[in-house]
Amino acid sequence: MKIFKTIISSLKHTKLLILIFFLLSIVITYLTTYIPVIIQYFIDVLLNQNVNNESIEFFISLFNDKLSFIPITCILLFATEGIIVLSTYIRTITKNKIIQEFQFELKLKLFDHIQNLTYQDFYKNSLADLVQNSTDDVNNIVNFIEKQFTYILDLVLIIIFAIGQLANLNIRLSVVMIVATLIIIILSIWYFKKSKPIIENKIKAQKELYTKINDNYSNIKFMKVNNLQEKEIERFEQVNNNNFEVSKKKIVLDSFYKTITSSIVKTQTPAIFIISSFLYANGIISIGSIYVTINYANKITRAFTDLAEILEFFNLCMVSYKRLNNLLKLTLEDEDKNNNIQIKNSTITFKNANIKVNGTTILSNLNFTIKPNEKVIIVGSTGSGKSILLKTLIGFYEYEGSIKIGDYEVKDLNKKAVRENICLLLQDSYLFSRTIAENIKILVPQISYPEIVELSSFFSFHSDVQKFNDGYDSKIGRNGIALSKGQKQRLVLVRAYTKPKPIMIFDDSFSAIDRINKKNILDNLLSLEDNSSKIFITHDIELAPKFDKIIYLNKGQALSGKHEELLNNENYKKLYELNLDKVGEEYV
């Protein structure tokens, strides 16, 4: 699966650290399981019981009496604990470094993937949602690896080392521990299967609850104006009740699992004592062996009782894993196509072009040419496909037939390379919570203050900036000044012209600008001789006579020509005259 490969590739820079982590884990768990054995031999030596270990017997033979064995054993225990503490400290540092690098690499790969998604996938999924969801999902996976993976690794290693030691003691005592552990494992598997759909439903219910709360806050003015508060409260209670019901099922399941497993753990120790007393009475095992058996049994079974929490984290992790895998399945833009282009001839040619969106033909049989430095306006009624036409030009939609920029066929080019030569200004203003100057400098950081003032004056924005206390250093957005929609659109125009491109597209970019400023800006742009093609999408068809060429979209077809020529088309003439009546001829 794609996310699995991405996770593995995100860990490749930490191979050495992972190896160190595993080696330290082996050392820690081995010494942890060997400490009870040292105590066992210590007890058995003091009680004059049989010690079936050649190395320990040799070690004991070095001392003249038992009392001299006591401080040496204590030193050995403290030294072992010291090694465990030091190894644990180094392992923690190593793990944190692995997690830090892994989290950074994984988020970087996912963010890079999101940035390169096709326009269709961006359209279906909000960028903010994609980034936020992927960040949350990465955090879930990282938290599982950081907190639970170490626990699982230690558990596996403890079982391996402990079973080896128990096998040397007594098989009957080992059976009690093994049976108790198997019952807990079976219960854990049952819990895993039962909790999986509950956790998935819980996440879904929590998301619905969050969405409802967010909608209520976002639309609070609308609800107040229309007295919808009580209805919204009812809907909120319904969503909250659904969330509560799912949570209640989870609580019942957790309570049952924990009750059974804790009962098994509590029953296990008395059972071992009873069996041990018979074995001890018959001289089969020693007191030290009983201690070791109980110690190991409690270590293993108590570790398994925490398996429910691990499995809950695992289920949550799997939900995130699936979501990230679905994210990575989204289509990327064609990175393998030619991206080493520089458009010298900005002639745009549509020849027998058909544009489809989600399988539906929006525009068909498009045939027209836009020459360099030509001022073109694209008009048509709402929904006629004006924006789709030019978004296809920059690679947002697929098409049949031919659409060329100069000698290059658009569908054969890398989308990023196309957009390096085309500037698309949308109706929405995309600004950052920075100063006005910083927003203007995003494309060209080295632009000078006089150049900013000159461009701002060109787009009738400088006089507005002068009214702010901090001028171009005024912060916009949160805790800053509030720009009107028209001011935002003018700021975006200034920013775009810090780095003009061979083809400039204005997709209803003046919609919020007042009529006087709109006329001044349009006159400035139309009189600007900078060898760039300028294409305007607008509902203001009354502006058509100002342009070199008009492309009129109607019922999926396109007509192109000068204003006087298109007046022969009845639909165009009707649309033009209707708009002219609304605004008055003095605006034209």
Task: Pin down the residues of each PLM region.
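Helix-to-loop junction immediately C-terminal to a conserved catalytic motif
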Residues: 393-395
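Cytosolic ends of transmembrane helices, especially the final helix of ABC transmembrane type-1 domains
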Residues: 205, 224, 228, 252, ...
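Transmembrane helix-loop-helix hairpins at lipid-water interfaces of multipass membrane proteins
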Residues: 18-87, 167-172, 284-287
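Transmembrane helices of ABC transporter permease
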Residues: 17-30, 77, 83, 150-201, ...
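C-terminal portion of ABC ATPase nucleotide-binding domains
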Residues: 523, 527, 531, 545-588
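ABC ATPase nucleotide-binding domain helical subdomain, centered on the C-loop/LSGGQ "ABC signature"
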Residues: 108, 326, 402-404, 412, ...
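Juxtamembrane loop-to-helix connectors within ABC transporter transmembrane domains
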Residues: 95, 115-159
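Loop segments that connect adjacent transmembrane helices in multi-pass transporters
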Residues: 123-128, 201-251, 321
